[in-house]
Structure formats: structure tokens, C-alpha cells
Amino acid sequence: MNETNDEGDRTLAGNSVTQRLDQEVHDFAMRTRFFHEDMTPGRARTFVRQHRLNTRQRNSVLKLRVATNCPDWDIRMRILDACTQEVIADEEHGGGRAHWQILEQLGVAIGMDLEGDIRAAKPLASTQMCWHAWDGLMSNTHWLEGLIANTCAERANIPGYGQGVMRE
């Protein structure tokens, strides 16, 4: 049963959709080692390599499939704006740099070689598996399912999920 709460958010049986998504993302963060283990130098390097690849693939290919299938112009424009921040330039949070460029700078700052270590990185099997799963959600299902998959993936980057350093 759909209702509306005091803030005007759509709700499902008294819980806002956003609250439910937040709970799912939090539960994922609590059961996934990445969100509560120490950030070792090796994990930091792997994060730079894989997240840089993921930022480019998900935002230049996969999210655009959702935007293409979305019939709502305003939502489509918000998806494209988010992709632009990730791939071209983020004036709001990145000082005009794309998110993949920020990750390259982070890698260099922790001692990684830009060409040989960061740009030459290949996706891990787990990264490829995630891309295949997202491809299925964003290409072969209703556009809302792709939007929800994108939303959950992005919300995990917002401080407040999991515990320890990743929560901050």
C-alpha cells in the first residue's frame, strides 16, 4: 500500500522507500568485509585500481543505459548530470576533476605509478562479475530496477554505512 509521509516521500506500508533502501545498503555494508576492515596499503592500491575502472565503466556505459530507457526527462537529466560528474568534471565535490581523475591522484599520492600501475590495471574477476550483474539490471529490466541498482551502489559511498573508517 503506497502512502505519503509528512515530508511528502512515497512510503510502502509506513516506511519510506529511501529508508528501506538505506537499510538494505547498511545491511550490505555490515556483512561486507570491505566496509569494516582496516584500510591497508594493499587494499588502498586495489581500491584505486578497481574503483577507477568501475567509475569509468559504470558511468560511461551502464548508467547511460538507464538514462536511455527512462521516460521521465527530469530523472534522465539527473542521471546524465551524475555521469558527467563521474566521467567529465565534478564542480560540486571534485574541484572540476572527474572522479576517475581524483582516484588517479589518490593513487599517485600513495606511491602508485600512474601509467604502469593505475592506468594499466585490469578488472578483477569480481569487478567484471559486478559489471555483468549491473549490465543485466540496467539493460534487460525495467528502467526503475536499473535506477534502484545505481542508487544503492552510490549510497554505499556516502558516509554513514558500515562501521569504522568506511562509515566516516
What residues fall within each predicted segment?
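Terminal targeting/low-complexity segments that flank the catalytic cores of oxidoreductases
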Residues: 1-77, 121-124, 137-145, 157-168
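Active-site-proximal alpha-helical scaffolds that flank and shape metal-associated catalytic sites
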Residues: 12-18, 80-168
